[in-house]
Regions:
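Intrinsic-disorder-associated interaction segments
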Residues: 3, 62, 106-109, 113, ...
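Elongated alpha-helical scaffolds
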Residues: 51-73, 136-153
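Hydrophobic/aromatic-lined pockets within catalytic cores
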Residues: 18, 22, 69, 73, ...
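A broadly used, surface-exposed interaction patch
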Residues: 68, 74-144
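Charged alpha-helical initiation segments
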Residues: 1-59, 63, 72
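Charge-enriched, short contiguous segments at helix-coil
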Residues: 127-167
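Surface-exposed polar/charged interaction patches
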Residues: 16, 20, 97, 123-126, ...
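Structured alpha-helical bundle/scaffold domains in large eukaryotic membrane-trafficking regulators
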Residues: 25, 29, 76-84, 166
Length: 167
């Protein structure tokens, strides 16, 4: 069930977020905890622990929002969450509410997160989707786009490790 997987990803991402505190702030004296330069220095010095947590945060939090966005789209209609350039036979079955066999399901391609959040935004803005969670996601559209960009920058280019105080 994608809903459960989404919340497992959220749980992992949040655990790692709180782990960054352990990786950095536990080693700071009380007077250093307000000094951003010292905090960022400790994060860099601890290196691997902070970076591991940081990567898990970006990957798993983005994964949660991607799965939940697609779930919201699918709840309205499965076609909102799939690539419309797919197999026309499968699309025909979906349009006519004909059950898909396992081979059809295997060949169904879901949209990328960036496209999914764009679709969700249009559906909410046009009153087609009125779900409170969908509205909340759309009200944070720029943040979700930035999160997706951050995750893609990390995964595909291995760049953009945020300083601890930016996180």
């Amino acid at each position: 069930n994608n809903h459960n997987v989404a919340f497992y990803s959220l749980s992992i991402g949040l655990e790692e977020y709180f782990e960054t505190y352990h990786q950095v702030c536990v080693y700071l004296s009380e007077y250093e905890r307000d000094d951003k330069e010292k905090i960022n220095y400790k994060a860099e010095k601890n290196g691997i622990g902070y970076i591991k947590s940081y990567l898990n945060i970006a990957i798993h939090i983005q994964h949660f929002f991607e799965l939940e966005t697609k779930r919201l789209l699918e709840k309205e209609h499965v076609l909102f969450a799939v690539d419309d350039k797919g197999d026309p036979i499968i699309l025909n079955k979906l349009l006519k509410n004909i059950s898909l066999n396992s081979e059809d399901t295997k060949n169904l391609k879901s949209v990328e997160f960036s496209e999914a959040i764009d679709r969700l935004k249009k559906l909410v803005e046009n009153g087609i989707l009125t779900d409170e969670v969908a509205i909340l996601f759309v009200s944070n559209y720029k943040l979700l786009k930035a999160l997706n960009n951050l995750r893609n920058t990390i995964i595909h280019r291995g760049k953009r490790i945020m300083k601890y105080c930016e996180l």
